[in-house]
C-alpha cells in the first residue's frame, strides 16, 4: 500500500470512491440537479469539459445512463433538484456516481442509514458486486446485521484501537458486542488508529 494521509485530496481520490455517512452534508449538493451531482468529481475530465466549458449534452447523457443503470427515480430525470428526491434515491445517486468511478477501494460509511428495506437490499447487492469484481470494500457501519451479512472480515474498533479481528462465519452478534464495548480484546492487542 501507499501512505496517503498527507496527500492532497485529488491524489487520494484517484484511487478510491467514498460513500459518505451523511448524504446531505457530504454526498450531494442539494441545490444542484441530479446530473450536476453525478459529475461532481469528474467535471474536469475531457469527456465533460472543453476549454473550461462544461459539455452539457455529454453530462446529461452520462447522468441518464447512471439513472437507468442504478434505477434512480426522480420526477424530472437528470434535471431534478437533488433536494426534492427521496432519501433512498439520493443514496442510489451517490452509489451510482461513486461506483461508476471504478476505483480499486470503496469506502462506504453507513451506506444504508435511514433507508427503506428495498433501497437497503439494492445497496447491499451493489457493494457485494463490487467486492466480487475484486475491489476492496471498507464498510463502516453500526448496523450489526449489515456488518455480519456483508463482511468477509470484521475489524472492531474500541477507544481508537483495533481490539478484534473476526470472521463473520465464526462469530455472532453477542461476541461482536463484547468487542465493541471493550469487554473483550484479541490477545495480541490492538493497533492504534
PLM regions: where:
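Hydrophobic anchor residue at the start of the ABC signature
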Residues: 95
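A short, surface-exposed alpha-helical micro-motif characterized by mixed small hydrophobic
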Residues: 147-149
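Conserved short hydrophobic beta-strand within the ABC ATPase nucleotide-binding domain
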Residues: 153-156
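A short, proline-enriched helix->beta-strand linker immediately N-terminal to the Walker B motif
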Residues: 98-106, 110
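H-loop/switch region of ABC-family ATPase nucleotide-binding domains
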Residues: 141-142
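Conserved P-loop NTPase catalytic core
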Residues: 1-85, 164-167, 172-174, 178-184
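Helical segment within the ABC ATPase nucleotide-binding domain
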Residues: 120-133
